[in-house]
Amino acid sequence: MNGTEGPNFYVPFSNKSGVVRSPFEYPQYYLAEPWQYSVLAAYMFLLILLGFPVNFLTLYVTIQHKKLRTPLNYILLNLAFANHFMVFGGFPVTMYSSMHGYFVFGQTGCYIEGFFATMGGEIALWSLVVLAIERYVVVCKPMSNFRFGENHAIMGVMMTWIMALACAAPPLFGWSRYIPEGMQCSCGVDYYTLKPEVNNESFVIYMFLVHFTIPLMIIFFCYGRLVCTVKEAAAQQQESATTQKAEKEVTRMVIIMVVAFLICWVPYASVAFYIFSNQGTDFGPIFMTVPAFFAKSSAIYNPVIYIVLNKQFRNCMITTICCGKNPFGDDETTSAATSKTEASSVSSSQVSPA
C-alpha cells in the first residue's frame, strides 16, 4: 500500500519514513508545501466571496418580484438553496482547515462538513435532473398538453431532497464513512479503502450508479431529445422568428448546461472512481485535491448558468440592484416580447432557458 490508513482517515503518503500523522491533529505539510495550503484557503475564500452574493440575490430577487414565483422557479430556488448548503456548511470549514494545514474540527466536524458538501452537491444535481425532465416533457411533449404546475414543482423539490438524503445520510449511520481527502482539509466519502466494517465497497458502487451515472444519463437523454425537437421545429419553419430565436437560445443553454456539468463533476467522479478501482496504487494528494476543489466551484457556475442567463430573472435582478430601475432595458418591452413568443405553438415558457 502506498498510503497510510488510520482508524478514521487515509493519507495518500507512505509511512516508511514515520512522518505521517493524523490529519485531525497535526499539520500535513509533508503532503504539500505550506504555500499550497494557503492557495487552497484563498481559493475557498474566493468561492465564498462570489458564491454567497449570487445565490443570496437569487433568493432575494425571487421574493421581491411576484412574477418570478413560477413553478419552474421553485426548482431554481432549490438549486440556489443547495448552493448555500455548500457555501455555508462546507466552504468556511475547508477554508479554515486549509489555513492551518489539517482538518482542525476533528472527526465529528469531518462528518458534518462531508454531509453538508454531499447534501448540497446532490440537491443541486437532482435539481438539474428535474429541470431536464421538465424541459423534455414540456418541449418534446411525450404527454400531450402537459403543463408543469405548482404541485409538480413541489414534488420535484421533495424528490431532490429525498435523493440527496439517500446519498449523504448513510455514512452518518454506518454505511461507509466520511474522511479527509486529498490534502486532508476537506471531507468526502471514503473512496480510498474497502473498509468492510462499514460495507464501504457496496456504498461506493451504489453512489456511483444511483447518484451519478443515472442522473447523468437522464440529463443527456432529456436535453438530447430537446435539441432534436427544437431543430425539427426550426427546419419545418413552423414557428415565428421570435420563437426560432428562443429555440436557438435553448440550444445554446443546453450546450452550456451539459458542458458545465461535465466540467464540474466528471473530473472529480473519474478520479474518485479510479482511486476506488485501483486501491493501493501510488498517487499524490494533489491528484484528488484539484478535482475535489474544482467541483466546489459549481456553487458559482449553477446560478450563473441557470439563473443569470434567464432574461426575465436577469432584468429583475438588475432592477433590484439598481433600486427599482433597469438602466439597460425596459421590463415592459421584455414582457411584451415574451408574450408574443408565448403565442406561438412552441411558447417561450416551454423553450426559453429555465
UniProtKB/Swiss-Prot annotation:
Residues 334-354 have a biased composition (Low complexity). CDD domains: 7tmA_MWS_opsin (cd15080). One of its GO terms (biological process) is visual perception. GO terms for molecular function: 11-cis retinal binding; G protein-coupled photoreceptor activity. Gene3D superfamilies: Rhodopsin 7-helix transmembrane proteins (1.20.1070.10). The chain crosses the membrane at residues 37-61, 74-96, 111-133, 153-173, 203-224, 253-274, 287-308. The modification N6-(retinylidene)lysine is found at residue 296. InterPro entries: GPCR_opsins, GPCR_Rhodpsn, GPCR_Rhodpsn_7TM, Opsin, Retinal_BS, Rhodopsin, Rhodopsin_N. A motif ('Ionic lock' involved in activated form stabilization) lies at residues 134-136. A lipid is attached at residues 322-323 (S-palmitoyl cysteine). Keywords: Cell projection, Chromophore, Disulfide bond, G-protein coupled receptor, Glycoprotein, Lipoprotein, Membrane, Palmitate, Phosphoprotein, Photoreceptor protein, Receptor, Retinal protein, Sensory transduction, Transducer, Transmembrane, Transmembrane helix, Vision. Residues 62-73, 134-152, 225-252, 309-354 are cytoplasmic. Photoreceptor required for image-forming vision at low light intensity. Required for photoreceptor cell viability after birth. Light-induced isomerization of 11-cis to all-trans retinal triggers a conformational change that activates signaling via G-proteins. Subsequent receptor phosphorylation mediates displacement of the bound G-protein alpha subunit by arrestin and terminates signaling. Belongs to the G-protein coupled receptor 1 family. Opsin subfamily. This is Rhodopsin. It comes from Ambystoma tigrinum. The gene is RHO.
